[in-house]
Swiss-Prot record:
PANTHER family: N-SUCCINYLARGININE DIHYDROLASE (PTHR30420:SF2). It catalyses: N(2)-succinyl-L-arginine + 2 H2O + 2 H(+) = N(2)-succinyl-L-ornithine + 2 NH4(+) + CO2. Signal peptide: none annotated. It comes from Pseudomonas putida (strain W619). This is N-succinylarginine dihydrolase. Residues 23-42 are annotated as: Disordered. Gene3D superfamilies: Succinylarginine dihydrolase. Pathway: Amino-acid degradation; L-arginine degradation via AST pathway; L-glutamate and succinate from L-arginine: step 2/5. Its EC number is 3.5.3.23. The active site is at residues 174, 250, 371. Catalyzes the hydrolysis of N(2)-succinylarginine into N(2)-succinylornithine, ammonia and CO(2).
Length: 449
């Protein structure tokens, strides 16, 4: 039976704005309070989805969240009608309103961790929604994320869903942004690679000094247990604390893996040789031939990697066995990074081609191509069990473009978030979207009695 890696990209929500909410994310903080263009952001994301689908890659869509999150504001003590809640928050605590309007759920690499059926004890695909405990504006996402994933992957014969881990710092979990998987082919047992920033309970592990380590070892271990992964199919690695302090807030900002290949920066991990040795040995035991592509700091400094998002790229397997690297426009605009990529593709190695996309609206908020997608490896029978409404096709692309143009504003500043009409616009748009994607009632406003 054939197997595929399906990329489910986050559809940018209608409240996309530059709130500067993500401490430790250089782009997010440096572009704080600029005016955004939600319509352009959504169109840029859809263009990437459509282009990759047209190239033969399996592509799906993950719906955005309901924002502003009025229920979250009510939990913080704001009362009255929905409009009054928004206006009170704007008057008394604007940062809380900005957080409740964040469209950060577009970065679905943080939505969940996914283990394919070939790796799990019960032979089902397992999903654990990420608690995103480190940032308030993201910590409110997981209940809706869980409902959306359950609506997309509803067949219990094939799919198992786990709630987010306890929402405390010791189990800080950022999902697939700190997880990748190596395998000979997508349908065969592979090696799942969990990268953490610190240990919650063992003080012997080093930790960053400037920016927070968002993922704990204990969270990664808990997800592996929930998914029924065997020890011979798991490798844990600690991210280098010094690169976290340079703005590498997730591992997908400093490395990317796919198939048998890990593309990583020289400074990405602690004890790199031991980590690579484990990956090589465990993948070999499953019939695979692990390949590591190391990018030396002399060629690309960590600062350049963070500014260009070289590693926040998609490494995609083509039918001929070669790989395509999908990068943001910022890589082409960085002389050192672009020179390295030209050298990489001319060497005759696994990466044969680089494809560039304009994702400026997302990039200015600190999210590149890899942030925008959640990878799910599926056998043919499992893919057939996925809700067909979320699989990208030419008609769906056209429908979603029309939907975006109908409902999204082309300019959004901080003051606009206080407009109660924005809430009405967003709910109207999302109500229509759930019909387009055949999701049912996944949003809080649709579930109110």
């Amino acid at each position: 039976m054939k197997s595929y890696e399906v990329n489910f990209d986050g559809l940018v929500g209608p409240t996309h704005n530059y709130g500067g909410l993500s401490y430790g994310n250089v782009a997010s903080q440096s572009n704080s309070q600029q005016a955004s263009n939600p319509r352009e952001a959504a169109r840029q994301g859809l263009a990437k989805m459509k282009a990759l689908a047209d190239m033969g890659f399996k592509q799906g869509v993950l719906a955005p969240q309901e924002r502003p999150d009025v229920a979250a504001l009510r939990r913080l003590g704001f009362s009255g009608s929905d409009a009054e809640v928004i206006q009170r928050a704007a008057k008394e605590a604007m940062p809380l309103l900005v957080a409740s309007c964040s469209a950060s759920s577009m970065w679905v690499a943080n939505a969940a961790t996914v283990s394919p059926s070939a790796d799990t004890a019960d032979g089902r695909v397992h999903f654990t929604a990420a608690n995103l405990n480190c940032k308030y504006h993201r910590s409110i996402e997981h209940p809706t994320t869980s409902r959306v994933l359950a609506a997309m992957f509803s067949n219990e014969q094939h799919f198992a869903h786990h709630p987010a881990l306890p929402a405390v710092a010791q189990f800080g979990d950022e999902g697939a942004a700190n997880h990748t998987r190596f395998c000979r082919s997508y349908g065969e047992a592979g090696v799942e690679f969990f990268v953490y920033g610190r240990s919650a309970f063992d003080s012997r592990y080093p930790a960053p000094q400037k920016y927070p380590a968002r993922q704990t070892l204990e969270a990664s271990q808990a997800v592996a247990r929930l998914h029924g992964l065997s020890d011979d199919g798991v490798v844990y690695a600690q991210q280098n604390p010094s690169v976290i302090d340079q703005g590498v807030f997730h591992n997908d900002v400093i490395s990317v893996g796919n198939g048998e290949v890990l593309f990583y920066h020289e400074d990405a991990f602690l004890e790199t040789d031991a980590v690579l040795g484990q990956l090589q040995a465990k993948l070999a035991s499953k019939g695979g031939n692990f390949q590591a592509i190391r990018v030396p700091r002399a060629a690309v400094a960590v600062e350049d990697a963070v500014r260009s998002y070289l590693f926040n790229s998609q490494l995609l397997s083509r039918d001929d066995g070669s790989m395509l690297l999908v990068v943001p426009e910022e890589c082409r605009n960085n002389e050192r990074v672009w020179a390295y990529l030209q050298q990489l593709t001319s060497q005759g190695g696994a990466v044969k081609e680089v494809k560039v996309f304009d994702l400026k609206q997302s990039m200015q908020n600190g999210g590149g191509p890899a942030c925008l997608r959640l990878r799910v490896a599926l056998k043919e029978s499992e893919l057939a069990a996925v809700n067909p409404g979320v699989i990208m096709t030419a008609p769906l692309y056209d429908t979603l473009l029309q939907w975006v143009d109908k409902h999204y504003r082309d300019r959004l500043g901080e003051a606009d978030l206080a407009d109660p009409q924005l809430l009405v616009e967003c709910r109207t748009a999302l109500d229509e979207l759930t019909q387009i994607l055949k999701l049912g009632s996944v949003y809080p406003f649709q579930r109110q009695p």
